[in-house]
């Protein structure tokens, strides 16, 4: 049986067994993060030009392991901790109930036990303000962040000289100047950050491609649209993911590419990423074509998940050569084809899709860390475009009011599935 949970959407009328009354505070989601049966949600943002939206919506946290009666905690904007435009969540790898919330304007908010503890800004951390001292305005624009395997915390800090920051385990801050690999000096927005198996930090950008930094030797390189130096389909890099083979999956405004030699990146004269070529009824085509790719996630079995701007979500095998799932608003409970973010909780096998109309969770039944595959893979393989997915294969996390009344449900004795009356 599958639980359908309405959390933040304007969709109703879906087959369900159970429904959570509690939910996130809004269906206007900007980003999510998931791990160990915990889901975090933020609602801030920026526009396509990376201008702050000045949203003061706080954050939400679902703790599936909580013994409390309410599993969802919603925190409104707090003037005592005035972080607005929260755009990214980094869960502490050693504490599921501690998270670092990036703010596109206020720095970074540290949350522990669901309560804000401190906001890191230019007065108490290594983060920099894009405005100079003495100027009346302030804007500390932080986005992608991640912990490396040694516990160091890497953070993007846009529109300042040292665009990459590192908080070491001893509490020291370092800043790294990436200006030598920046070619577009006006559109300086930064997106996601990922760390590969060699310790290189990969950063997506609005118009500077993929920026790569390795602290060992202070090595820097950028992948752009030029042949021999990246061959990206577009300089707007929206998402990055690193798989177990240290391949870098790069989603751009105009499609997907993969860079397969991260270990040798700084020694290569030619360092081009390549599209994934699939067989479409005997015709070779690029996986996802020229679609904008907003998010890439990798599950415990190394399957790849792609969220597109207008085409819904796609799940593939580890190489990307075979489609396992093709979800859209017509064949699944997705409330929209605009996928903002995909995150996988490898402890539960759930794949979370944040759309512009709410959040959906799909039970992939991939065992933790890829130990086994569930019967979920009995779908048509490859998936046909017209294939419809049963709504009972999803958890739906929707509710734009926080007071959802579950639909009346009855048992269908013929197929032992719950159906809506």
Regions found by a protein language model. Give the residues of each.
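C-terminal outer-membrane/trafficking sorting elements
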Residues: 388, 395-421
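Carboxylate-rich, polar loop motifs that coordinate divalent cations or form catalytic acidic clusters
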Residues: 1-379, 386-391, 397-398
């Amino acid at each position: 049986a599958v639980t359908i949970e309405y959390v933040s959407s304007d969709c109703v009328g879906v087959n369900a067994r159970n429904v959570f009354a509690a939910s996130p505070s809004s269906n206007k989601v900007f980003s999510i993060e998931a791990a160990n049966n915990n889901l975090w949600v933020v609602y801030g943002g920026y526009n396509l030009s990376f201008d702050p939206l000045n949203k003061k919506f706080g954050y939400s946290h679902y703790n599936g392991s909580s013994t409390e009666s309410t599993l969802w905690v919603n925190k409104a904007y707090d003037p005592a901790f005035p972080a607005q435009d929260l755009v990214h969540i980094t869960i502490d790898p050693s504490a599921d109930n501690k998270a670092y919330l990036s703010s596109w304007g206020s720095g970074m908010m540290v949350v522990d036990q669901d309560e804000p503890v401190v906001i890191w800004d230019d007065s108490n951390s290594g983060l920099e303000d894009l405005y100079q001292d003495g100027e009346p305005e302030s804007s500390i624009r932080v986005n992608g962040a991640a912990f490396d395997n040694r516990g160091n915390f890497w953070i993007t800090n846009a529109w300042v000289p040292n665009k990459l920051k590192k908080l070491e385990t001893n509490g020291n801050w370092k800043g790294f100047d990436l200006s030598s690999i920046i070619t577009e000096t006006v559109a300086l927005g930064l997106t996601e950050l990922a760390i590969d198996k060699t310790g290189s930090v990969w950063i997506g950008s609005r118009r500077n491609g993929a920026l790569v930094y390795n602290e060992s030797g202070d090595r820097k390189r950028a992948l752009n649209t030029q042949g021999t130096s990246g061959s990206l389909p577009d300089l707007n890099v929206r998402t990055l993911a690193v798989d177990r083979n240290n391949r870098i999956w790069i989603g751009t405004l105009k499609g997907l590419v993969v860079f397969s030699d991260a270990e040798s990146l700084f020694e290569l004269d030619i360092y081009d990423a390549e599209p994934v070529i699939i067989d479409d009824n005997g015709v070779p085509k690029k996986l996802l074509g020229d679609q904008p790719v907003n998010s890439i996630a990798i599950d415990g079995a190394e399957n790849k998940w792609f969220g597109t701007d207008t085409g819904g979500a796609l799940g593939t095998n580890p190489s990307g050569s075979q489609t396992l799932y093709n979800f859209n608003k017509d064949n699944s409970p997705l409330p929209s084809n605009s996928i903002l973010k995909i995150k996988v909780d490898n402890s539960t096998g759930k794949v979370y899709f944040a759309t512009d109309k709410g959040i959906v969770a799909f039970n992939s039944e991939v065992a933790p860390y890829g130990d086994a595959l569930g019967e979920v893979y009995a779908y048509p393989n490859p998936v046909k475009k017209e294939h419809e997915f049963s709504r009972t294969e999803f958890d739906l996390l929707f509710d734009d009011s926080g007071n959802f009344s579950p639909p009346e449900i009855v048992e269908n004795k013929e197929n032992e599935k719950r159906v809506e009356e």
